[in-house]
A protein has these predicted regions:
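Transmembrane alpha-helical segments of multi-pass membrane proteins
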Residues: 25-42, 46, 72-76, 98-111
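Membrane-water interface of transmembrane alpha-helices
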Residues: 1-19, 79-86, 151-156
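Membrane-helix boundary/juxtamembrane motif in polytopic membrane proteins
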Residues: 88-110, 159-164
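N-terminal signal-anchor transmembrane alpha-helix
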Residues: 12-62
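Membrane-interface segments at the starts/ends of alpha-helical transmembrane spans
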Residues: 97, 125-142
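Alpha-helical membrane-embedded segments
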Residues: 1, 108, 136-153
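Hydrophobic alpha-helical transmembrane segments in multi-pass integral membrane proteins
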Residues: 105-125
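Generic alpha-helical transmembrane segments
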Residues: 64-86, 106-112, 141-146
């Protein structure tokens, strides 16, 4: 929630003349909302996969709260990338929404999958406690919804100075 409130301040830290922004603007695929949306979708998939991999690795290490650091770093890197997509986009508002919708749809798919798994959760043997599995699936669902909204807002709505 704080990220959405301070979106303008976060976006103001990314410069139009920055290396990453200029690199994206020079790419021919970035001009199309569909191809840039697919790249954003793949970026979100990659970041979620990397964070999930590190959290899986951390289950083997007995260091408490380190998973929160990994989640925080993944969130910061994702918001940084979404901000670069926002600043680098040159095109109509309608095409920006297309790009944001395609790119953030990964989190909608992840949320629907987590909801399906939660609703169809059954014990594998009689007496199995499913509390932790249900809690994990609810956490994935909440994270997916928050990431969906944050990604869409950061990539789909320009800074006020960018409106034309």
């Amino acid at each position: 929630m704080f990220l959405l409130i301070f979106k303008g301040k976060i976006l103001s830290r990314i410069k139009q003349e920055g290396r990453w922004v200029q690199t994206l603007q020079k790419k021919s695929w970035f001009e199309s909302p569909y191809s840039s949306g697919i790249i954003l979708f793949l970026w979100n998939t990659l970041m979620t996969g990397v964070v999930a991999f590190f959290i899986f690795i951390l289950t083997k290490v007995n260091i408490p709260f380190l998973h929160l650091v990994i989640l925080g770093i993944g969130t910061i890197i994702s918001i940084w990338a979404w901000s670069i997509f926002n600043i680098a986009w040159i095109g109509s508002r309608k095409n920006r929404f297309k790009m944001a919708s395609i790119g953030s749809s990964f989190y909608a798919i992840l949320g629907v999958y987590a909801l399906y798994r939660y609703l169809t959760l059954k014990p594998s043997y009689p007496g199995e406690d499913l509390f932790m599995a249900a809690l994990g699936l609810m956490a994935v669902l909440i994270i997916a919804v928050v990431a969906l909204l944050t990604c869409f807002v950061f990539t789909g709505f320009p800074k006020k100075e960018q409106l034309y």
